[in-house]
Amino acid sequence: PKDIVAVTMPCFGTTDKTLQNSLKLMEALGVTSRTVPVKDAVLQHFKDISHDENNKNAAYENAQARMRTLVLMDIANDANGIVIGTGDLSELALGWATYNGDHMSMYGVNASVPKTLVRHLIAYEGKRLGGAAGAVLEDILHTEISPELLPPEDGKIAQKTEELVGPYELHDFYLYHAVRWGFPPEKVLYLAKAAFKEKYSDDTLRKWLKNFYRRFFSQQFKRSCLPDGVKIGSVSLSPRGDWRMPSDAESRLWLEKLEEKP
């Protein structure tokens, strides 16, 4: 385990809970642990590009992710190692990653693992390991999914991914039926209504399906230059494998199908 260099890089949005969980997990797993705060480096970068640190726009958020990738790449060079990417299939489908930030690595181990499966894997591994590692993984499993790029509110996570882009259980369902089977939008929606009728309203399902198609099309440019990664399931978005799509493809025809009332 000591050959694995695990790095935590706290910045503006890092909560004490997630920081402590990362430190506890590294200790429990026995890996080499490093803490590299990037706040000062990002603030200096803001000065260099004349960005007001109070302007919490895309540059404010993405600069943190790109600074972290810079740190990881250079640590990897020093350690004569490679950067292992943490991004998963759901994030790639939605483009929920910073271009040349967490989007980039030297090998993406989770590239074909959807977020819902990630949750199951964490739960399984927590039970298998038990002890301190199991307790931390259990806590991580019940922590809101967040990139933590915006400052916390009262010490708690302010930026909650599933409130912004939609529930991952829906997006993974949409992705599977749209990509694996090539079903049209109206059929994907029909199946979602049958599968989730006890949990989500028809309007909610339609809303997040529209968002899925909008993001899936507009974010293809990030998938066109992915690091290598392993294919695990039946769906892959690698441009070198199962998925080839022009980055300027238009989602309009798919979205129009969802405007048609049954």
Go through each PLM region and give its residues:
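ATP/NTP-dependent adenylation/nucleotidyl-transfer catalytic domains that generate, transfer
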Residues: P1-P262
